[in-house]
Amino acid sequence: MSSDRPSGARSNESEPAGRVKARGSELLDALERHLPGSRGHADGTAAYAFAAAVGLDLERDQAEAVREAARLHEVGNVYVPARVLVRLPGELTAEDRELLDARFASGAGLARGAGIPDQVCQWIRASGERFDGRGPAGLAAERIPIESRIVRVACACDSALAAPAPAPGGASSDERRRIAVHALRAAAGSELDPRVTAALATMLERGAPAP
């Protein structure tokens, strides 16, 4: 059965939704203290993930659950030294890569402890997987939940838009979108799901603003 068929997000705690959401916000507060700027990236990733989920015709409640997974997808970064999180890929050691691979499972555990629905926690864990199967658990293509693939592309989208401008003086919004689209399409089929990438890239090409 294709993993593109979404399954409902089930709560692992019989608690009011507002209390659970507040606990999720506490995780983000801790992450922001650990690495300033993380909350902005979480919010941006969540916005792009929701837009992609709606564009791919997921049901509204499923799209909302994807947004929550995207919002919390990097809370496991609190277990990774900040100096490692800001290193460029070519500067990472083998130990650094192990920490970075483990952060998604760690983040899923933190989210589960905060009462986040089990299915959302699974999506957080799988959001570290690569479409080509070279991620932490070796899942590839449709073995990765569609929700996790959406989160991965949304994360890459927000990161690309936030990247420093290549020329002095910065770049216009149109130029940033063009650069982001190029980066997303270049990673499609290797790191990123091509279908999800195409959906978000098309939104950017049509002038969708940053969230």
What is each PLM-predicted segment?
Residues 15-211:
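Histidine- and acidic-residue-rich, metal-dependent catalytic cores
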